[in-house]
């Protein structure tokens, strides 16, 4: 798998720093990471309850101890309308058959003024060029299932949903190599790329805020059952309720 390889570990380390910066000042009660349990995107966030959505059958095997794992699919999120403060999509849209539906679901569950943070591979980069060439010769560098989306396209989709773009970053300027020692030799490209050609980083991160009209309670919300997430199955409700009682 990509994220177990030296290039994958390099991506995870780089994105960890990006997510730490993006979520550190985001407050609320519920935060949701969709997939990629190898990455703790909410490490520096202080929300009351951190949830991770994983495919059916993987909620135990891939569980990250920092999260409460929930089984489901991103196209049909098992949460009530306007119930989540923060949603993280690490490399989700580019591997989805219907990324528009995922964004619609994220929009449905986010509270007004809630935030979505998205990461993805940048097609306008050396890694993107390597992937394009690999498809022509039958030797992919990144997973062939990915339909890598440009940052501009994702920005357009978010604007159509009336989201306000908050911040964005590019990262990972090393050459698309496979061996760890060869990638380590390219470390000098990080500072050069960040200064001279930042938009050609191999990965990007974008943060946006939901600007739909709506109201939100001010102050501490009582810890009553699970009205914010009533669509969970019984076992999941009991598990999350236990966590809520300990907050």
Residue ranges and their predicted role:
Residues 164-190, 199-200:
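Conserved catalytic loop of SAM-dependent methyltransferase domains
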Residues 100-115:
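A short glycine-rich, Lys/Arg-flanked "PGG" loop and its adjoining helix->strand segment in the class I
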Residues 188-247:
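C-terminal lobe and adjacent flexible extensions of AdoMet/dcAdoMet transferase-like proteins
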Residues 133, 145-168:
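Short alpha-helix
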Residues 115-145:
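Conserved class I S-adenosyl-L-methionine
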Residues 75-87:
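A short acidic, Gly/Pro-enriched loop at the edge of an enzyme's catalytic core
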Residues 17, 21-76:
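Class I SAM-dependent methyltransferase SAM/SAH-binding core
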């Amino acid at each position: 798998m990509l994220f177990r390889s030296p290039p994958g570990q390099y991506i995870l380390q780089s994105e960890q720093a990006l997510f730490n910066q993006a979520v550190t000042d985001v407050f609320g009660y519920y935060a949701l990471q969709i997939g990629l349990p190898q990455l703790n995107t909410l490490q520096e966030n202080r929300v009351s309850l951190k949830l991770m959505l994983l495919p059916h059958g993987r909620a135990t095997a891939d569980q990250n101890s920092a999260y409460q794992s929930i089984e489901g699919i991103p196209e049909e999120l098992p949460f009530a309308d306007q119930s989540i403060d923060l949603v993280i999509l690490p490399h989700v849209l580019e591997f989805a058959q219907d990324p528009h539906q995922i964004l619609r679901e994220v929009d449905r569950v986010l509270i007004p003024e809630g935030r979505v943070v998205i990461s993805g591979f940048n097609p306008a980069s050396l890694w993107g060029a390597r992937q394009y060439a690999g498809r022509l010769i039958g030797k992919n560098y990144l997973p062939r299932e990915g339909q890598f989306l440009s940052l501009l396209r994702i920005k357009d989709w978010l604007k159509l949903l009336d989201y306000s773009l908050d911040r964005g970053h590019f990262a990972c300027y090393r050459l698309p190599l496979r061996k760890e020692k060869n990638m380590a030799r390219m470390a000098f490209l990080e500072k050069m790329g960040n200064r001279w050609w930042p938009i050609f980083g191999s990965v990007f991160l974008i943060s946006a805020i939901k600007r739909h009209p709506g109201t939100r309670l001010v102050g501490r919300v009582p810890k009553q059952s699970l009205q914010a997430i009533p669509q969970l199955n019984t076992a999941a409700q009991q598990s999350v309720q236990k966590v809520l009682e300990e907050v």
